[in-house]
From Swiss-Prot:
CDD domains in UniProt: alpha_DG_C, Dystroglycan_repeat
Keywords of the record: Cell membrane, Cytoplasm, Cytoskeleton, Disulfide bond, Glycoprotein, Membrane, Nucleus, Phosphoprotein, Postsynaptic cell membrane, Secreted, Signal, Synapse, Transmembrane, Transmembrane helix
Signal peptide positions (record): 1-29
Disulfide bonding pattern of the chain: 182-264, 651-695
Chain positions with Phosphotyrosine modification: 874
The Peptidase S72 domain, residue ranges: 585-694
Organism name: Sus scrofa (Pig)
Any one annotated GO CC term: basement membrane
Site positions (Cleavage): 635-636, 697-698
Biased composition (Polar residues): 814-828
Ranges for region Required for binding DMD and UTRN: 862-877
Protein name per Swiss-Prot or TrEMBL: Dystroglycan 1
Region described as Required for interaction with CAV3: spans on this chain: 801-877
Function: The dystroglycan complex is involved in a number of processes including laminin and basement membrane assembly, sarcolemmal stability, cell survival, peripheral nerve myelination, nodal structure, cell migration, and epithelial polarization.
């Protein structure tokens, strides 16, 4: 009994001992063998706690590292393949979104089939975008339980980013890109197709599909094409040397520019075959395949972005200007500081932040590592001025403050002690309730206070403070030049305009450029005149102009940006005016005659620009750069221009005919649409369209009188030196001299005709002479024409010539019985005359012999010839 009771008491004791030994062994096995192991475990737990978002370490989602950061360029396609095998290895669901958000940025598209993230960013998408890729598994209750996640960044660069770098980053074949890269200073030839589309209304998939459909016409890869929206309604490029129309009659949407590279520094002779773009764009085949109307196309040379020039500051300003000193290499600290006062500092609340935009945003999750580029403000609050070191000797105040120049970031002023001046007093520290106040650059009259000199390049301006000796607020900082304008290209006779980008200047108080006041000036602080060929609208911040042939060359201008406090920054840039890209090879010249005097139009740049805009509107063009003004002459207002959209070769006869019928009738009278477009400022009288260049032998619209097209292009403007003299010379040259020449030719021709007529009529008889000598034969000799030297023979005896013999005696008639005294009349003689012949005894009749003397000529006559023939002698019976 006692034994059983002892066993019953030992069993619980052994059980407790066994449990104690077992717990000690387990504890010893889990405790680290060395102190270093314990420390290492503590560090691991600390590191895990730092990277954990939740309070419990076991509930945190593990982070997978392996997706590299990417870069994209505005207007170019972006594509990256996500290695899902690193994230989802067991069939989990992949979710891609912006870090800390539920959806992707508006320019990105995720394809779950190919595990590809692709898109096309616009100008509004610049900056750094953090993308989160997570894998989730479907839980028992139907919800998605996160398993793993990874975050990477995509930085979007602006459109003018270095092309080789951007292309090399996106191209799968680096060797192909390197072979097509142009030199640093060599222009890039780009072909641009203008589409009637709005990229802001497209989803990312539609933008990429548009680029893919364009591949059949461009024959280039996606990463080499660029698609950007139209900015400031500039559909066409003024620097284009080739252009063509599309099938769109008018533009409805904002417009999109789809371009790709053709080569380096090409011209019209070296441009490759573009019939694959020109013909489909005009006939509508391209529009049918792309799904959007095609407005037109053009080819231009784009100058690559050059390194930024050294800032040239104009120092003749009435406001304080920071003196340029050697760059400092001091470590940049956050712009918050402690005011050296024995009381609490005056720090503005975070809601009054006015800091320049920072490219790298702070990610939503603390597990993301941020790679900063440039100056980043760790504390985005508006703090007072940086502390300065002041050396005091006796009664001395802080003197000349000379800010130093730093590379990107904020200005960090340093202090320079001035010699002691016994006339000033030490500043006293004010009460901590005093709020800062921004000093004005204009001298202000206040109470007696110490004077602080601010050293500038311009004449020093005294800034008076109150007796407290501390500034009442953060001083106004001058605007900073962020991006240079550098260079503007213009062409003779072609209207140009340049919108100043909003990121050209930046001011800490007034922010971007559109909040600043811009002024265009010449070298010596001289404002641009009203009659200058370059004008600037400060309200819209638009620079525009219309150069002529006298402005060819390089011109330097200065853009001043002034903030509300009166401080300014300056950017120097150049305007290069080139000669007409087409020269004299334009296929047609349009000439219009308007009512009025040309002098006001020639001397007023605004009227010339208005004329060019109205002419472009009459042709249905929204871009004024399609019109190149050639000349404005007298004779009312005669305006001559060319159309830059016409191809040079071969002769675009159909296009010119279509443009001619759009503005003029067949007889040269302006159409109603053309007149309505230019009225009431310009009233058209007549229009002429003459072929030139490749169409020089054609006349499209008749002109009365026809005007011969000169071989050389006349100047764009009438010279202002002596317009009256030039007009008189034109009148003499085109009116007086031709009239005198024609009159002289007619006079000489009349004289020659008269001489020939007189010579032809010489030797011919008049009608009376012809009537007198009608019959040919022996002429009749009148009595006064006879030779009176010999007496005429007697009429009683017959005429016997000297060579003749004596006549025979008269015959005798023995049977005659009629007495001699019986008179016979003519009838009786006639009756009896034949009776004598019948006498058988009568001798035969013998006629007198002929003349023996020869006939000397037609006009000669025989000598001693009587004017009439004598009858035979009368022989009585």
């Amino acid at each position: 009994m006692r034994m059983s009771a002892g066993l019953s008491l030992l069993i619980p004791l052994w059980g407790r001992t066994f449990l104690l030994l077992l717990s000690v062994a387990v504890t010893q096995s889990r405790w680290p063998s060395e102190p270093s192991d314990a420390v290492r475990d503590w560090e691991n737990q600390l590191e895990a706690s730092m990277h954990s978002v939740l309070s419990d370490l076991h509930e945190a989602v593990p982070t997978v590292v392996g997706i590299p950061d990417g870069t994209a360029v505005v207007g170019r396609s972006f594509r990256v393949t996500i290695p899902t095998d690193l994230i989802a290895s067991g069939g989990e669901i992949i979710k891609v979104s912006a870090a800390g958000k539920e959806a992707l940025p508006s320019w990105l598209h995720w394809d779950p089939q190919s595990h590809t993230l692709e898109g096309l960013p616009l100008d509004t998408d610049k900056g750094v975008h953090y993308i989160s890729v997570s894998a989730a598994r479907l839980g028992a209750n139907g919800s998605h339980v996160p398993q793993t996640s990874s975050v990477f960044s995509i930085e979007v660069y602006p459109e003018d980013h270095s092309e080789p770098q951007s292309v090399r980053a996106a191209s799968p074949d680096p060797g192909e890109v390197v072979s097509s890269v142009c030199a640093a200073d060599e222009p890039v030839t780009v072909l641009t197709v203008i589409l009637d589309a709005d990229l802001t209304k497209m989803i990312p998939k539609q933008r990429l599909d548009l680029l893919q459909r364009m591949q059949s016409f461009s024959e280039v890869e996606l990463h080499n094409m660029k698609l950007v929206p139209v900015v400031n309604n500039r559909l066409f490029d003024m620097s284009a040397f080739m252009a063509g129309p599309g099938n769109a009659k008018k533009v409805i949407e904002n417009g999109a520019l789809l371009s790709w590279k053709l080569g380096c520094s090409l011209n019209q002779n070296s441009v490759p075959d573009i019939h694959g773009v020109e013909v489909p764009a005009r006939e509508g085949a391209m529009s049918a395949q792309l799904g959007y109307p095609v407005v037109g196309w053009h080819i231009a040379n784009k100058k690559p972005p050059l390194p930024k020039r050294i800032r040239r500051q104009i120092h003749a300003t009435p406001t304080p200007v920071t003196a340029i000193g050697p760059p400092t290499t001091a470590i940049q600290e956050p712009p918050s500081r402690i005011v050296p006062t024995p009381t609490s500092p005056a720090i503005a609340p975070p809601t009054e932040t006015m800091a320049p935009p920072v490219r790298d945003p702070v990610p939503g999750k603390p597990t993301v590592t941020i790679r900063t580029r440039g100056a980043i403000f760790q504390t985005p609050t508006l703090g007072p001025i940086q502390p300065t070191r002041v050396s005091e000797a006796g009664t001395t105040v802080p003197g000349h403050i000379r800010p130093t120049m730093t590379i990107p970031g904020y200005l960090e002023p340093t202090a320079v002690a001035t010699p002691p001046t016994p006339t000033t007093k030490n500043p006293r520290v004010s009460x901590p309730t005093k709020k800062p106040r921004t000093p004005r650059p204009v001298p202000r009259v206040t109470t007696k206070a110490p004077i602080t000199r601010l050293e500038t390049a311009s004449p020093p301006t005294r800034i008076r403070t109150t007796t407290s000796g501390l500034p009442r607020g953060e001083p106004n900082q001058r605007p900073e030049l962020k991006n240079h304008i550098d260079r503007v290209d213009a062409w003779v006779g072609t209207y140009f305009e340049v919108k100043i980008p909003s990121d050209t200047f930046y001011d800490n108080e007034d922010t971007t450029t559109d909040k600043l006041k811009l002024t265009l000036k010449l070298r010596e602080q001289q404002l641009v005149g009203v009659k200058s060929w370059v004008q600037f609208n400060s309200n819209s911040q638009l620079m525009y102009g219309l150069p002529d042939s006298s402005h060819v060359g390089k011109h330097e201008y200065f853009m001043h940006a002034t903030d509300k406090g009166g401080l300014s920054a300056v950017d120097a840039f150049e305007i290069h005016v080139h000669r007409r890209p087409q020269g004299d090879r334009a296929p047609a010249r349009f000439t219009a005659k308007f009512v009025g005097d040309p002098a006001p139009v020639v001397n007023d740049i605004h009227k010339k620009i208005a004329l060019v805009k109205k002419l472009a509107f009459a042709f249905g063009d929204r871009n004024c750069s399609t019109i190149t003004l050639q000349n404005i002459t007298r004779g009312s207002i005669v305006v001559e221009w060319t159309n830059n959209t016409l191809p040079l070769e071969p002769c675009p006869k159909e296009q010119i005919t279509g443009l001619s019928r759009r503005i003029a009738e067949d007889d040269g009278k302006p159409r109603a649409a053309f007149s309505n477009a230019l009225e009431p400022d310009f009233k058209a009288m007549s229009i002429a369209v003459t072929g030139s260049g490749s169409c020089r032998h054609l006349q499209f619209v008749p002109v009365a009188p026809p005007k011969r097209v000169p071989s050389e292009a006349p100047p764009t403007e009438v010279p202002d030196r002596d317009p009256e003299k030039s007009s008189e010379d034109d009148v003499y040259l085109h009116t007086v001299i031709p009239a005198v020449v024609v009159a002289a030719i007619l006079l000489i021709a009349g004289i020659i005709a008269m001489i020939c007529y007189r010579k032809k009529r010489k030797g011919k008889l008049t009608l009376e002479d012809q009537a007198t000598f009608i019959k040919k034969g022996v002429p009749i000799i009148f009595a006064d024409e006879l030779d009176d030297s010999k007496p005429p023979p007697s009429s009683s005896m017959p005429l016997i010539l000297q060579e003749e013999k004596a006549p025979l005696p008269p015959p005798e008639y023995p049977n005659q019985s009629v007495p001699e005294t019986t008179p016979l009349n003519q009838d009786t003689v006639g009756e009896y005359t034949p009776l004598r012949d019948e006498d058988p005894n009568a001798p035969p009749y013998q006629p007198p012999p002929p003349f023996t003397a020869p006939m000397e000529g037609k006009g000669s006559r025989p000598k001693n010839m009587t004017p009439y023939r004598s009858p035979p002698p009368y022989v009585p019976p």
